[in-house]
């Protein structure tokens, strides 16, 4: 195998060729960074209603999200190396087709974790302690599909752990609004990863892999809808808390109406249970992440300069 072939295999292992997963982790991480900065500003005293994070914090958490997502993909392929070859969508992955070995996947995981850990040098020491949970969750998630029908919950916790880390980095502690944001993110992630699992459900049943799509059965779309409603309600409450003291009031909350329409379109597609339709619904969630980030970012910038 040539150097270019090996490099391409590593790129596929870490999914740098498929940025959808990066965005699904990146945008919510930045939601946390922005809200934590708002909270810190509001804690400073009367008359201060908004604030923005420092550029360094913003960059560190963005890079951390990208690197830890890649690490998660590497350990996921290591865990699934014996089953990916039996699933039509994953049989071309580099461990499944033999282009990379299990040792090379573990090495890639460790290198990416170490690179992520190096970013902690730019953050308060408390964040270092919180990072242990992030690594543990990222490592154990891929193995959960063998033992429980709720691997999507572990994925959501692993991906969402950057939110409390952002609050600890900026505010010094994870407050109730941090955990509500984390819960909202958990609901959204379990919903979209169930859509993803619906695309593989037939193959997963054959090879004995567990998922929420299998657990929910014919109630899958209903439960996804309920999770999405919970996301909207909790996110609306978080936005209410941060923006009501500002000149925008509850205006940003109304912006979630577009997200509700996005969710409705996704569920309409998933109702057919067609694998491609479910996968396309999953992919559509990058626009949810982008839009909610834009909504929060614009509101934070506006209120920082206009009160």
Swiss-Prot record:
Obligatory cofactor(s): Mg(2+)
GO biological process: ubiquinone biosynthetic process
Membrane-spanning segments: 19-39, 48-68, 105-125, 127-147, 150-170, 172-192, 221-241, 243-263, 282-302
GO CC entries: plasma membrane
Keywords: Cell inner membrane, Cell membrane, Magnesium, Membrane, Transferase, Transmembrane, Transmembrane helix, Ubiquinone biosynthesis
Group of enzyme by EC: transferase
GO molecular function, a single term: 4-hydroxybenzoate polyprenyltransferase activity
Topology term for the membrane: Multi-pass membrane protein
EC number: 2.5.1.39
Reaction catalysed by this enzyme: all-trans-octaprenyl diphosphate + 4-hydroxybenzoate = 4-hydroxy-3-(all-trans-octaprenyl)benzoate + diphosphate
Pfam families on file: UbiA
Database matches in Gene3D superfamilies: UbiA prenyltransferase (1.20.120.1780)
Pathway involvement of the protein, from the record: Cofactor biosynthesis; ubiquinone biosynthesis
Localization annotation: Cell inner membrane
Family annotation (HAMAP family): UbiA
Function summary: Catalyzes the prenylation of para-hydroxybenzoate (PHB) with an all-trans polyprenyl group. Mediates the second step in the final reaction sequence of ubiquinone-8 (UQ-8) biosynthesis, which is the condensation of the polyisoprenoid side chain with PHB, generating the first membrane-bound Q intermediate 3-octaprenyl-4-hydroxybenzoate.
Similarity comment: Belongs to the UbiA prenyltransferase family.
Listed PANTHER family: 4-HYDROXYBENZOATE POLYPRENYLTRANSFERASE, MITOCHONDRIAL (PTHR11048:SF28), PRENYLTRANSFERASES (PTHR11048)
Name of the featured protein: 4-hydroxybenzoate octaprenyltransferase
Gene that encodes the chain: ubiA
């Amino acid at each position: 195998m040539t150097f270019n072939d090996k490099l391409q295999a590593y790129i596929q292992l870490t999914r740098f060729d498929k940025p959808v997963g990066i965005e699904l982790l990146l945008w919510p991480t930045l939601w946390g960074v922005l809200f934590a900065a708002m909270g810190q500003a509001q804690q400073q005293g009367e008359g201060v209603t908004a604030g923005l994070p420092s550029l360094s914090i913003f960059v560190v958490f963005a890079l951390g999200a990208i690197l830890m997502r890649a690490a998660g993909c590497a350990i996921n392929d290591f865990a699934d190396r014996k089953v990916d070859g039996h699933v039509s969508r994953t049989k071309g992955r580099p461990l499944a087709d033999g282009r990379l070995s299990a040792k090379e996947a573990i090495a890639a995981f460790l290198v990416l974790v170490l690179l992520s850990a190096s970013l902690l040098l730019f953050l308060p020491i408390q964040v270092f302690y919180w990072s242990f949970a992030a690594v543990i969750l990222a490592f154990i998630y891929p193995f959960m599909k063998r033992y429980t029908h709720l691997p999507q919950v572990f994925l959501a916790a692993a991906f969402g752990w950057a939110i409390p880390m952002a609050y600890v980095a900026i505010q010094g502690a994870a407050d109730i609004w941090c955990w509500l944001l984390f819960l909202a993110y958990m609901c959204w992630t379990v919903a979209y990863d169930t859509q993803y699992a619906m695309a593989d459900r037939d193959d997963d049943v054959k090879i004995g892999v567990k998922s929420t799509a299998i657990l929910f059965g014919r109630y899958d779309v209903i439960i996804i809808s309920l999770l999405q409603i919970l996301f909207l309600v909790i996110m609306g409450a978080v936005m209410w808390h941060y923006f009501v003291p500002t000149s925008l009031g509850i205006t940003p909350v109304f912006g979630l109406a577009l997200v509700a329409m996005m969710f409705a379109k996704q569920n309409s597609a998933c109702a057919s249970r067609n694998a491609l339709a479910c996968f396309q619904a999953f992919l559509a969630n990058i626009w949810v992440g982008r839009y909610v980030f834009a909504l929060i970012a614009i509101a934070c910038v506006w209120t920082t300069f206009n009160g």
